[in-house]
Amino acid sequence: MTPSLYNPLAIASKPFPAIYSEKILIFTIFSAFAEFERDMIVERTQEGKMLAKQNPDFREGRPKKFTKQQINHALTLLENHSYKQVEDMTGISVSTLVRAKKKKAAEAING
């Protein structure tokens, strides 16, 4: 009886080294394709960034959710209200308020 591709028991009847060698071969092929695809993604991303940087209005990174005016308004509200109250009023998270307050204090010192 010859081994068939449609017979799963045919693979199990092969000696162990052949199965191991086939697994290594398949793993190597899939690894090479994965590495190739990753390299292609990196290359396309870098090309896209270079094209985007030609635009004078391009800013790298995540866009700001709140304007400076909104942050400053929230910081003035902090003078009379708690962080939680200001968060409820403005929708600006406590962590963002703390970060903005530290940044404002550092700017005042470095001035």
Swiss-Prot record:
Cross-referenced SUPFAM superfamilies: Homeodomain-like, Resolvase-like
DNA-binding region: 83-102
Molecular function as annotated in GO: DNA binding; DNA strand exchange activity
Coiled-coil positions: none
InterPro entries tied to this protein: Cry35Ab1_HTH (IPR040652), Homeodomain-like_sf (IPR009057), Resolv_N (IPR006119), Resolvase-like_N_sf (IPR036162)
Pfam family, one: Resolvase
Family: Belongs to the site-specific recombinase resolvase family.
Protein name: Resolvase homolog YefC
Record keywords: DNA-binding
Domain Resolvase/invertase-type recombinase catalytic: 1-56
